């Protein structure tokens, strides 16, 4: 374990001890405020100086405002002086992370947070949204509970990061890929099946479906068009939830590492996890083609037991619509 990792491991232990002490505070608002401040102080130590932490209201250019946020990270360098003089209101474009901190996560607190982050998204907010809780009221899967409360869980969830101390750290990732990466033109031509209204064009030349395999035309990556669509530009997204579950400081270290890696030019977050080697699982998967069609939506609270090599797809196209659909290969 590196010195940096050891020091932050000790800071996290201290944070948890302070949380236990704060339990004796009777006033819920003060108790929650203490926990928020101590957690935000820890976060402030792993972000570059150009970023600042504040508590207040996020506003967009239309004057629409968010609910009061526990705290957020914003880019101080892009703000003009007249805005810096009143940081009670921060432009949505400047936000880089938005946090909600809970002492005990329950169903009500979860739904309230989802609602807050939904309003932030409506303002045009695109920064990662984080729900961190020091404890929880359930023994079961935190991610599964969240899945059941957010209709957009698989694709565009209101929470991008869910972290419960001594239990689990989960984050949502999306990758954009091109069909040509997994199916070169040569393979497409070999396996394509004729469909009604399927029009092909190679460069400026229209070609019949039946003559496609016999043509002597040179077909490169950007010359083939299917019903007016450039084959090389057909793309799709892979939505996945990753996470690590552990009853220890590895949960907070993973969260801090992720924040640091996102905001720093270099991946300094790896220092926080040095010697830890957390085992991350994929808990959900979902594919979305460039026309918004969703397929192969799956979730397992224990982690999915297959990988991308176990996925197959079909592509169909006509004058009205196009679909690139994925599914798990049958055994």
Language model segments and positions:
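Intrinsically disordered, low-complexity Ser/Thr/Pro/Gly-rich regulatory segments
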Residues: 1-68, 73-331
């Amino acid at each position: 374990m590196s010195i940096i990792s050891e020091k932050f491991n000790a800071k996290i232990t201290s944070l948890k001890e302070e949380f236990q002490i704060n339990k004796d505070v009777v006033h819920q608002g003060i108790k929650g405020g203490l926990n928020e401040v101590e957690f935000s102080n820890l976060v402030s130590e792993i972000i570059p100086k150009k970023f600042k932490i504040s508590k207040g209201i996020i506003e967009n250019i239309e004057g629409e405002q968010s609910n009061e946020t526990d705290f957020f990270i914003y880019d101080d360098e892009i703000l003009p002086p007249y805005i810096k003089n009143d940081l009670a209101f921060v432009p949505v474009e400047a936000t880089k992370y938005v946090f909600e901190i809970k002492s005990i996560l329950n169903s009500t607190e979860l739904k309230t947070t989802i609602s807050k982050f939904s309003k932030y998204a409506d303002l045009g907010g695109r920064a990662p949204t984080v729900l961190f809780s020091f404890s929880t009221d359930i023994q079961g899967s935190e991610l599964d509970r969240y899945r059941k409360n957010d209709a957009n869980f698989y694709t565009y969830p209101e929470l991008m990061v869910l972290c419960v101390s001594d239990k689990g750290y989960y984050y949502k990732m999306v990758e954009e890929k091109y069909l040509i990466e997994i199916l070169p033109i040569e393979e497409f031509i070999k396996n394509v099946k004729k469909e009604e209204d399927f029009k092909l064009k190679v460069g400026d030349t229209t070609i019949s479906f039946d003559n496609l395999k016999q043509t002597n035309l040179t077909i490169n990556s950007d010359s083939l068009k299917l019903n007016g669509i450039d084959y090389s530009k057909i793309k799709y997204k892979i939505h996945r939830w990753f996470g690590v579950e552990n009853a220890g400081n590895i949960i907070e270290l993973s969260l801090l590492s992720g924040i640091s890696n996102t905001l720093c030019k270099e991946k300094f977050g790896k220092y926080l996890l040095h010697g830890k080697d957390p085992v991350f699982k994929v808990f959900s998967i979902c594919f979305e083609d460039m026309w918004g069609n969703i397929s192969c939506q799956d979730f397992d609270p224990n982690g999915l037991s297959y990988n991308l090599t176990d996925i197959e797809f079909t592509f169909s196209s006509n004058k009205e619509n196009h679909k690139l659909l994925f599914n798990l290969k049958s055994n």
